[in-house]
């Protein structure tokens, strides 16, 4: 109403209202807008996200041979985003149901939670379901945020140990929740493999009852996973020290193509009565990156304790985002609960996993056999999943970007999904050039 009245005023009359216009009881000082607000003057400029920064640099590069090996999203052999046919089919079938857009419960769609946790825990599920608390989350990061806030509120220890190195956002999520973040040894640069002795030593040295974050499969960023025997040793150390296991499983099925194999650690811990919680994501194995479908689950001692944990989880989620989005969870639930679609999806996951394995083999073969590079590249095929820790140093990474228009993180991590039959030789030749000097 005021806006309409002001537009009807003569310009000279409007000009006289410089400092005393009142709108809905709030005095508007026109002269103050000229001075600007000083309340945010001390907010420092934050550093750009390293992964999204790589993507921006890639987009600005006009070279036809440019490569983006930083982003953790799957690409097909043509370098294009890949929407799984099973996901397309699920969307079509869901659309025909004309579902509403009402709020989901605070902990999400119940059937999705059941299907997600069954996928994760497998044969162990039936023995733990009565004391398992679950909540649909905003993908894996959302599950980690629920976990971080719950542990900060209710777990005695306020220190969490993460692998060195770990996913870049882990430290941010847990420190923002008020937890102290420390690290344990994980990657051995000399062997480009797992430093199991250092890891077990650090877990033993940590105070009893510490929170230990473990990558369930396809370790990010190294691609280095423990063997089953090493997982057994890790479990024994965790039990001896009464540590709390926080398992981050973002790549089930996507790592090896085998859902059970990728969930080995999760099921081992769940069946061994170790205090634990699990964070799941369907971003990678269903390609639901923008749909943000995930699941948080935590094991209680009994059903009564589970009820109390669930009540606090609901309060926590209500404060964070109230209710999770429904579309991604509906897609995932539809696939998981439909035998034919589930079988189709499983085959597509195997296909994605096999393509990544083939790119690892091709890269190694070109470097070692075709180019006769003086270094060993065995670690490329020893590692697993979407990422590979190449061993390239920051200086070599800079040369790759400036001279070859190839973009990856400073620590030498590459996303294998960025490689395809058209560009893998170019990348190998670039690596050969920067490592031969």
Swiss-Prot record:
PROSITE patterns for the chain: AA_TRANSFER_CLASS_1
Disulfide bonds: none
Organism: Schizosaccharomyces pombe (strain 972 / ATCC 24843) (Fission yeast)
Annotated compartments: Mitochondrion matrix
Molecular function as annotated in GO: L-aspartate:2-oxoglutarate aminotransferase activity; pyridoxal phosphate binding
Sites where the protein binds L-aspartate: 72, 167, 220, 413
Role: Plays a key role in amino acid metabolism. Important for metabolite exchange between mitochondria and cytosol.
Gene Ontology biological-process entries: 2-oxoglutarate metabolic process; asparagine biosynthetic process from oxaloacetate; aspartate biosynthetic process; aspartate catabolic process; aspartate metabolic process; glutamate metabolic process
Keyword Cytoplasm: no
Listed EC numbers: 2.6.1.1
Enzyme class: transferase
Annotated keywords: Aminotransferase, Mitochondrion, Pyridoxal phosphate, Transferase, Transit peptide
InterPro entries recorded: Aminotransferase_I/II_large (IPR004839), Asp_trans (IPR000796), NHTrfase_class1_PyrdxlP-BS (IPR004838), PyrdxlP-dep_Trfase (IPR015424), PyrdxlP-dep_Trfase_major (IPR015421), PyrdxlP-dep_Trfase_small (IPR015422)
Gene3D superfamilies: Aspartate Aminotransferase, domain 1, Type I PLP-dependent aspartate aminotransferase-like (Major domain)
Protein name per UniProt: Aspartate aminotransferase, mitochondrial
Catalysed conversion reaction: L-aspartate + 2-oxoglutarate = oxaloacetate + L-glutamate
Record Pfam families: Aminotran_1_2
Note: In eukaryotes there are cytoplasmic, mitochondrial and chloroplastic isozymes.
Residues annotated as signal peptide: none
Protein family: Belongs to the class-I pyridoxal-phosphate-dependent aminotransferase family.
